[in-house]
């Protein structure tokens, strides 16, 4: 307990110092005192919120135990991967394993399967997504899966998207949690009804994907000065589906609460970082729903899971950047998952 509080304070301190120096550099001496006070009050408050929410994430993590059998800590399915894109589904699926899932499946187009298998012997790869039976082929696995991550490396081929639509429908019918990213979000922007009101869905749009969804669902441009309000409104308009807007700070809402994750990352953004987020979120969503609302102190389990995945991704980015600087890539970030996880959640 003592070391946990210590680590939290150290991280919090670093954030305050970074923010204050940024403020001072920007505004110069006359505004110093005022800004400093305003900043430290506001930041101290949001850092306390962050630390409280991290504590809730720690509550949902299942203890490692020798009495459990394989598969109990999570069997995750990634739906994505086509001829053009094979990296994204690999990154999402391997991230799920590294975070603590026992098994990670990839349901991809047939051309992508040998490539993804060759990246890793640790994944189970099903070359079914472009088959006429795709929906049935995935559905028969659903009773054995705890969560689906839909979209990494999916592409926009009509036939594939039709199959994914069917997969989302059967997943909903079986109450399987779904994390939707990348071209999965493109599909949702075409047909918001697919996930409208589904409380076990989490959407993880970047800025472009967010604007497209906002446009499609609220039929008007968003107010770029009010990102909290925009995320809240999109979530509500989708029937309180959890939305995670990725950005300089990640903004999360379930239509009721808005959380901000500003865990220190780095200014390096590489393609693939979103796959680390969606893959780890698949596992955390399963753990959070398993733990239930008592463990999350009344907050939405999905929101707590999303906060955990955002913090973890940013911490991985931070650690990888310390070692590799500009040359940091997603593989370097994934190599940090173990250390980042224990720093945030097990210290
Ligand atoms: C749990 O909820 C109570 C009441 O809302 C709040 O006072 C407390 O700070 C929360 N604890 C954590 C760890 O978030
Ligand atoms: C979403 O949450 C808001 C705030 O609690 C509530 O007013 C609204 O009725 C909810 N919408 C749905 C569809 O449940």
From Swiss-Prot:
NCBIfam families: yjeF_cterm. Belongs to the NnrD/CARKD family. This protein may be expected to contain an N-terminal transit peptide but none has been predicted. One of its GO terms (molecular function) is ATP binding. The modification Phosphotyrosine is found at residue 85. ATP binds at residues 246-250, 265-274. Changing residue 81 to S: In PEBEL2; decreased reaction kinetics for ATP-dependent NAD(P)H-hydrate dehydratase activity; decreased affinity for (6S)-NADHX; changed ATP-dependent NAD(P)H-hydrate dehydratase activity; thermostability assays show that activity is lost at temperatures above 30 degrees Celsius. Keywords: ATP-binding, Disease variant, Glycoprotein, Lyase, Mitochondrion, NAD, NADP, Neurodegeneration, Nucleotide-binding, Phosphoprotein. This is ATP-dependent (S)-NAD(P)H-hydrate dehydratase. Residues 53-344 form the YjeF C-terminal domain.
